[in-house]
Amino acid sequence: MQHKLLINGELVSGEGEKQPVYNPATGDVLLEIAEASAEQVDAAVRAADAAFAEWGQTTPKVRAECLLKLADVIEENGQVFAELESRNCGKPLHSAFNDEIPAIVDVFRFFAGAARCLNGLAAGEYLEGHTSMIRRDPLGVVASIAPWNYPLMMAAWKLAPALAAGNCVVLKPSEITPLTALKLAELAKDIFPAGVINVLFGRGKTVGDPLTGHPKVRMVSLTGSIATGEHIISHTASSIKRTHMELGGKAPVIVFDDADIEAVVEGVRTFGYYNAGQDCTAACRIYAQKGIYDTLVEKLGAAVATLKSGAPDDESTELGPLSSLAHLERVSKAVEEAKATGHIKVITGGEKRKGNGYYYAPTLLAGALQDDAIVQKEVFGPVVSVTPFDNEEQVVNWANDSQYGLASSVWTKDVGRAHRVSARLQYGCTWVNTHFMLVSEMPHGGQKLSGYGKDMSLYGLEDYTVVRHVMVKH
């Protein structure tokens, strides 16, 4: 397995402390990788800064061609990437290969096209004898911090728009799931000029802090927890860096009495438990109107009970393990606290799986109240709660009564209600009669403590640029 860092176009071994990388399906150590040293972090940033002088002045066509080549090489090595993602994350292999790899390739191809469509405003005379124009220019060096739930996908979301806009990037994947990012580094080094892409390995304290705090870094992009976002914002405040934050969610799923119950059950069974629930948009916080509450709980419980956990290389496996032992304990603790309330009922699941690996049974909890921790706090596991509600006004208030603001969905046959409720929800994305659908052309991002900035779409590309005014006297 490729375990070297990419610094200034060269694959080099880390010079810091070695860290184990695990297979969460077995609990075994896959390999140990040496972290980047402080000197290597500095070298990577300085290489990116030096490369920016030329890369930032390339034409959109040149940048697009590089991104298209990278998309092609990922597609050609799709099986290799899927196997690495499966072994390092515990994802079902068929899901990694059939769902994630095509989406990752599409992200790079989309931004290759978007790079050639990014424009400033046309020139105009707003002062006599002077012509003004608006430019959208790259920022410089971007430090990108990717999470452990979708390592390669999130690397793509961060690399593609930053590079398309003309920035240079230093990427740090999670130390828990670094293997696909390191493999990507190996393939990218022969496509992009030296220093344009740099990939490091290490923990937040030893590598993330010196990277994000480096004076040559002009922007920090993070997908991670609220706590990590707070830390980076505080850590970088003195240097006034631009920050781009996607900090998780607790998606409300509002099910009205007139909803298609079978569609809701199928949707939540899939989108509440995909990737073992380790998804910031997971359909995990259901509000069911009282007229259909009992029916929904019964049917959804039966459906969730049929979800199959198993070995990632088994074609019939629907749920793999959680990413780490520490995360398994966090999820287990959250469910035990919910059970201890006395009013929350475990419909199915509610326990760790026996045997090796970090498996937790797909869980449905009924009778949760608005103020319960299981409703208010992100669990980030295969755990869905159901809360009954009376009317539209109440459920909109409850849905918005959250520190999160990333994703939401509304299930109803009433078109007017769908529009009315969607307009009032304080979430970056609202789906109607579906959930979890993402496309490269549409923006993904949140509000409130879920963060700010957009991934994907032309809005995502603009986030990696600075607006400049140029005035010419004539």
Swiss-Prot record:
Pfam families per the UniProt record, alphabetical: Aldedh
Miscellaneous remark of the record: 4-aminobutanal can spontaneously cyclize to 1-pyrroline, and 5-aminopentanal to 1-piperideine.
Reaction catalysed by this enzyme: 4-aminobutanal + NAD(+) + H2O = 4-aminobutanoate + NADH + 2 H(+); 5-aminopentanal + NAD(+) + H2O = 5-aminopentanoate + NADH + 2 H(+)
InterPro entries: Ald_DH/histidinol_DH, Ald_DH_C, Ald_DH_CS_GLU, Ald_DH_N, Aldehyde_DH_dom, Aminobutyraldehyde_DH, PatD
GO molecular function, one term: aminobutyraldehyde dehydrogenase (NAD+) activity
Protein name: Gamma-aminobutyraldehyde dehydrogenase
Family: Belongs to the aldehyde dehydrogenase family. Gamma-aminobutyraldehyde dehydrogenase subfamily.
